[in-house]
Amino acid sequence: MAEPATDHRQATAQRNVEAILDACEALAARGAALTIAALAAESGVSRVTVYAHFDSVPSVLQAAAHRAVERVMAVAAGMDLEPGSGLDALERLVGGVWPLLGEMDGLSRATGDLLAPEARRAAHGEVFDLIDGLIARGRADGSIRDDAPAAWQASVIYALIHTAVDDINHGRIAAADGEAALVSTLRAALRA
């Protein structure tokens, strides 16, 4: 059995990590500079505490991106993606996670600015695996075209999602129109 002091330290450490990740998301959403000092101030912990858990701002961003992906995957896990074609399932997935995507736009922009492309891709690994599976299913059932590499199609989906959120946040498209515009564009790009 764990000692009470150890349990308390572990709980405190976990609360600190969550506070730092929340701070990262909040700062990114505001477009504020992501620095260790800013993360410490926003999270209410010291810079030493931030460094005790993360060795750099990119490591905080990677952890925050991983947590965001976990939220997306939790929503996806609650969805029934089995019926219909691969393209139908992909459209349902995009529609199901769409409400989360706007909340994560600042974090997405920050990871784009501060993480190397391979680190961004790794942070989104589970989402890409899910999308890759739906693309493969759609190619096999004939609902998704097979005249372009599947990896390219996954990158197109990723880029379109982030572009749609960015356009909404910059007033180029109404929020109410975002999901429908995204789904119809994905359908046009992918349909066999």
Where is each model-derived feature located?
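Basic, helix-initiating cap at the start of DNA-binding domains
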Residues: M1-E42, S59
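Amphipathic alpha-helical interaction segments
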Residues: A19, A38, S59, D88-G96, ...
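Short amphipathic alpha-helical elements of helix-turn-helix/winged-helix folds
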Residues: A23-R30, G96, L100, L160
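Short hydrophobic/aromatic patch on the recognition helix
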Residues: G44-F54
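Alpha-helical DNA-contacting segments of helix-turn-helix folds
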Residues: P58-A68
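Hydrophobic alpha-helical connector segments
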Residues: A63, A74-E103, I157
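Helical hydrophobic small-molecule/effector-binding pocket
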Residues: L87-G112, R121-G133
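Hydrophobic/aromatic-rich alpha-helical bundle segments in the mid-to-C-terminal region
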Residues: S108-D113, R121, G125, A140-T185
